[in-house]
Amino acid sequence: MKIAIASDHRGYPTKQELIKYLSKKNYEVLDYGTNSTDMVDYPEYAFKLGESVANKKVDFGIVVCGTGIGISIACNKVKGVRCAKVDNIKEAELTRKDNDANVLALNGSMPLYRVKDIVDVFFNTNFTNVDRYINRINQIKEYENNNVTKKFEEKEVRNDA
């Protein structure tokens, strides 16, 4: 399995530990930066990783920043990416089973043992292919492709009292 990984400066130490961990588990790991704890802006790294996932150059991605929130927001701007900010193994399992997430976002302050458990569950859980989940993912894809139906358009709000 080929894994892309990226972080900002606050996620860098966790990213480096994850690269070692994943390599020992025989995953092929592509590092999209950053390469130090010097302050950087996470969107650049999130977009690079997201493009590699969307273009199927890798099977999955992992992004890490101080909270996991900002980098996940940036990653989700890439068409075809379904990035989930995960804090525990239950969320890791469900985001794969129900949402077919292809990028995992992590908090760089989380203990490494917990990060490893989350990563293992994420990579070892398959999408369920249940119709209702497929339908929801297809709605997201449709929206991304600008095939938005009227029900998603903004409606005028009237305050007639």
Protein language model regions, located:
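A short beta-strand-loop structural module common to alpha/beta enzyme folds
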Residues: 28-39
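Glycine-rich phosphate/diphosphate-binding loop of Rossmann-like nucleotide-binding domains
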Residues: 4-24
